[in-house]
Amino acid sequence: MKRKTCLNNGWQFLEKEYSEENLQCPDGEYMPVRLPHDYLIYDVRNLYRDSVGWYRRKLMYVPDGLERVLFFEGIYMDSEVFVNGRSAGTWKYGYSSFEVDITQYIEAGENELLVRVVHRSPNSRWYSGAGIYRSVYLIERESTHIASSGLYITPVKRAASDTWDVEVEVEAAHGADDEKPFDSIRYIITQKNGKHDMRTNEEDSLCIIFNQLIGEKSNIYRHTFEITAPKLWDIYCGNLYELRAELIKAGEVF
């Protein structure tokens, strides 16, 4: 089971430098904001100023045995995430997404999320903005799951053949008490888009399913399967295929 909920609403914002006295939650008049948000743009005459922004939000939690993870698509620049006054994680780069596992920090009922964003200049050759400039999501998942960005694909064409060997590596996370958390991994290959071929005026569709049993518990699972004569991408038809991996236990998607 996995649920992904957008948390772009319900935030409050305050721009204020921090010190040892107000390291986590400074006093001040917070203003309501909706993400994505750039606070540097408020002062167009001073777009490269050193500054610190604070974002806070309430989050309700009902214990159900699932992990809770905050997924940030982008914060500029250096950030730290607090849950109920405790630091849950930091991220020191403004141009990539990241996640923070807050499972051990949340409590039943109402919780407070606080994100501190530190912007220091000079840092770019262009206007970067500052703040939580992309969406934020709450992910609810089982303790056993495919890790974020944990699916790696390497297609290798056989010499003098139209057959391709698709090498897949899956990185899985397991709960501490899971001896054999799932029975198999199901791989599903489908055509994602680019169905119309300008040269032949034909539609193409593909759905291939592979089921691979697993042996001993591991963090990395590797499988290889073959595909014959896939339609390749070219300038006339942007063929694109999608591979989805699912963890299967007792015939059901985990």
For each predicted feature, which ranges?
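Short, solvent-exposed loop/turn motifs
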Residues: S87, H145, Y152, K195-H196, ...
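Short beta-strand segments of immunoglobulin-like
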Residues: G150-A159
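Extended acidic/polar, glycine-enriched regions
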Residues: E107-E110, E171-F254
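Beta-sandwich strand segments
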Residues: S19-L23, N123-G129, M198-R199, G251-F254
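Accessory beta-strand-rich segments of carbohydrate-active enzymes
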Residues: R3-Y18, V33, R45-S149, G175
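Extended substrate-binding grooves/exosites of carbohydrate-active enzymes
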Residues: M31-D43, R86, A250-F254
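Glycan-recognition and processing domains
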Residues: L23-H37, W126
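Structural beta-strand segments of beta-rich domains
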Residues: R68, D162-V168
